[in-house]
Amino acid sequence: MNRRKLIELVKDAVIVLLVLSAVFLGWESRLFGNTSADAGSFMALWQSITGGTAGGSPAPAQQAAQPGKPVAIALTDGAGGHYGVKYSLSELDNLYVNTARYFLEALSSAQPPQETDAQAWRAALKSLGVYFEYISPVRLSVLGDWLGISNVAAGLEGAAARRLCVIDSGGKNYLYFQDDATGKFYMAQTAVLSSIADQTGAFSPNSAVFAFEKNEDSAAPYTLLLPDVTEHPALDAANPLSSAAAKTKVLLTLGVSELPKPYTVDDTEVYVRNNFIMYLSNDGTVSWTAQDEAPVYRVTTESEAIDMAADMIADTLADYCGSSDTVAVYYDSTQEQAGGGYRIFFRYVAAGGAVYLRPDGYAASITVKNGRISEMELRFRTYSVSTEPAVLLPEVQAAAAAGGDFMLGYDDDGSGRLAPFWPKLPLRS
């Protein structure tokens, strides 16, 4: 490399550093309207924009597979046309990767939220923007943590929402959501950092429509409908732990070696160790409980508890649940426990439908207390699309008949065959 080229490269590097420095200082000085976001949020935002980590290396694949991915996403163009996805997990993954940054930017830069009304919320859903719908309400502070924000904007911390959207209105961006606890609607102006139009313009509207756009009197007006999707498959279910190799791997993950051997009670293997006891049923259900008293060395936040539980799910159920195009394990909800700690619930979602796994509907529940897992129940299943067709009422008619909020569901009663149905939400035992 000659001296002139070397000088030019140094100049280019200096220019890049100066630009980054200016952007960083602007961020820190609230130049972009980020009223409460910190430098960590800037780095998370930079990673989301560049697709890499702070050190410049590519972001790991796990980054796009957060426990709180939505079960429905809609892009709305300037004319009010929607491109919606609900039933294809691969399409949901792709859209999530390309649209999560709008919510990262909104949650980190929002002005204090202001109460608004249903009419404004409906207008927002028909405006240029991006819409996320979750299987259960998610605390916005937790959603921010999944997106890489250390602290969401002031006023958003305590809110929880199933449905939220970020819109572009006259060159200004706004976050809208419905608070789950009160049912009230809120909006907050946010910074304009990424062009929503660039993303929505890459897709042509499909049949997606919100229920209120077809029927103003709908009992579930904000349900996203896909009228052109008229067929939903039946599913086949199997117990992956019937494989000796899979069983051995799962046992090792859970801290169980082959010796000493378990004893058996009513077709259930019982493993007793110094610091835990574990039951493995012949239907693939694992019940694990810590036996020693957990040291109280720190308080676990809700976000930390969910992350810890999600890591366990990734190492266990997610490895055996089936093809990633068909099924995934989704975060469902959190219960704060008396005496401290959190119980985290997860659910299988297959072919775009929530699996109701008997007896209580969940794929797993994991309790985290004092910085460690103290108890868990894991229900191992492998789901695949059945070759037999399923008969189901079309979605639009189901919306009219539901009398409330609903989504596609599958009832796993242990028979091995799951037919689709339209249950009302919330999905609880």
Question: What does each model-identified segment do?
Answer:
Residues 10-18:
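Sec-dependent signal peptide hydrophobic core
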Residues 357-392:
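Short helix-loop boundary/capping segments
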Residues 17-304, 427-428:
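Preferential activation on post-signal-peptide N-terminal prodomains/segments
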Residues 332-369, 401-404, 410-412:
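Aromatic/basic-lined ligand-recognition segments
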Residues 257-283, 292, 297-353:
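Secondary-structure-rich domain cores
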Residues 1-7:
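N-terminal Lys/Arg-rich, disordered targeting/topogenic segments
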Residues 309, 344, 364-366, 405, ...:
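Conserved histidines in hydrophobic membrane contexts and catalytic metal-binding motifs
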Residues 92, 96-121, 238-253, 296-338, ...:
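Short, non-transmembrane alpha-helical segments in secretory-pathway proteins
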